[in-house]
Amino acid sequence: SVIIPVHNEEKNILSLTDEICVALDNLVNYEIICVDDGSTDDTRDKIIQLTSRLRNVRLVQHEIKGGQSAALYNGVVAAKGSIIVTIDGDGQNDPADIPILLDVFHSNLSDNPVLMIAGWRKGRKDTILKRVSSIIANFIRSRILGDAVPDTGCGLKIFRRSDFMEFPAFKNMHRFLPALAIRSGGVVISEVVNHRERKAGISKYGTFDRLWVGIADLFGVAWLLRRKFPDANPHQYKSDN
């Protein structure tokens, strides 16, 4: 299941969905879930057009804007697939990277009970201010959480649906998915992905939003990581009677 959280992306959602279909053409069973997070433009109508043209496209509609984490969460809840792929709705993530990340995921699946593949936008096509603020935000987060993931803000991620549903759900959780996977005893593998310039629309985050928004959540997640149950190696005693 491919989850696309979108808000006011009427000029990007059609071409992005078509690109995903091309990238996943060799897969027999997949679905695309577009979660419209209370858009005020024609995004919803564009997605409805897609659902009438493509049988594997579904719409989850937020009547009011709930935020990216809520859109992601409700998309995963609605998903029928056991493997989840997330991708941003602005078209800057390249759908052609999805099959590559899926290969990495399946190659490492048997060795790890909880596994997440996280995209790494090493050559970002953003302004210098955005790149600098993102570097600072990733540095602060990594120092506090110790997740050693270079780019948690990349929308391209792959994980099991069942693993995600075990994560605690909270506002801005999408910023901390790798840390939550590690908290669950998992492994996060970062893979370099292509990053493209935004062709249309405007960014939903200001230049320094990614630095300051979620600071309280950052310390909350740090507390959560410290409060993890110790591995007590539990087993049930069986009586001989």
Predicted regions and their residues:
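Short, flexible, basic/aromatic active-site loop/helix in glycosyltransferases
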Residues: 106-152, 157-158, 163-165, 219
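Structured catalytic core of nucleotide-sugar glycosyltransferases
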Residues: 1-127, 162, 166-167, 179-183, ...
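Short, hinge-like loop/turn segments at secondary-structure boundaries
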Residues: 76-78, 103, 133-137, 206-209
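Hydrophobic helical membrane-anchoring modules
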Residues: 146, 171-241
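Short clusters of hydrophobic/aromatic residues that line enzyme substrate/ligand-binding pockets
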Residues: 24, 149, 205
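Residues that recognize and position ribonucleotide moieties
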Residues: 77, 130, 157, 174-175
